[in-house]
Each structure stands twice: as structure tokens, then as C-alpha cells.
Amino acid sequence: MSPSPFKGQTGLKRILNATGYSLAGFLAAFRGEAAFRQLVLLNVVLIPVAFLLDVSRGERALMIAVCLLALIVELLNSAIEATVDRVSLERHPLSKNAKDMGSAAQFVALTVITVTWATILLG
């Protein structure tokens, strides 16, 4: 296997390349993953609401952080699904487990949003 042409880059060029890859990842997720688009919409609604609520700065930061956490988990879940599908589209118990575990992680992240927001708003 030949070495990656991107290894060894440093400084501004590395940062610019990494930013480009990140933006490409966001775009791929937004275009190809309905769940990611739904979470973006949820964040577009909840984050401004967090600024409108009469809560402490710490509570507001926590409310926003858990919303962003769900986006992070969905990006990782989508990456797992893409990798599994790239390896083989054949049904296999390990492939199912990998995809189900990614889905479970997203379920936990959404539960964290619900519990956090409910605790702050009802607390």
C-alpha cells in the first residue's frame, strides 16, 4: 500500500485541508442522510430557543452542547454505516451489530437531549 499523499503536511496547509474534508463530510451527510437533516432542523429550532429561555449561562451551554452531541453521534453513525456498506452489502450478523450499535448510540444521544432539556425546564 502506498503512503498517503496527505501525511506529513503541517501548518496552514494541513488545517485548510482538514477544514475542506470536514465541510465535505457535512455536505455528504446533509445530502445523503435524512436523519442528519432532521437533526440539523432540530438544532435550528432548539438552539435559538435555548437563547430565549430564562436559564443560567451554564444551563444554556449544556442545552446547546447536548444538541450538538446528537449531530456528532449521527455523523459517526453515518460513517459506520457507510464503511459497513463499502465492505459488503451482504447481510451479515456483524454488519447488523455495527449498524445497530451506531443506532443505539444515537438513541442514547437523543435521550440525553430529552432528559437534559426536561430537567432544566421542569427543574
Curated annotation (Swiss-Prot):
PROSITE patterns xrefs: DAGK_PROKAR (PS01069)
GO biological process: phosphatidic acid biosynthetic process
Swiss-Prot/TrEMBL cofactor(s): Mg(2+)
InterPro entries recorded: DAGK, DAGK_prok, DAGK_sf
Binding site for a divalent metal cation: 33, 81
Gene Ontology cellular component terms for the protein in this record: plasma membrane
GO molecular function list: ATP binding; ATP-dependent diacylglycerol kinase activity; lipid kinase activity; metal ion binding
Annotated EC: 2.7.1.107
Function: Catalyzes the ATP-dependent phosphorylation of sn-l,2-diacylglycerol (DAG) to phosphatidic acid. Involved in the recycling of diacylglycerol produced as a by-product during membrane-derived oligosaccharide (MDO) biosynthesis.
Family of the protein in this entry: Belongs to the bacterial diacylglycerol kinase family.
Protein name from the UniProt record: Diacylglycerol kinase
Organism: Pseudomonas aeruginosa (strain ATCC 15692 / DSM 22644 / CIP 104116 / JCM 14847 / LMG 12228 / 1C / PRS 101 / PAO1)
Gene name for this UniProt entry: dgkA
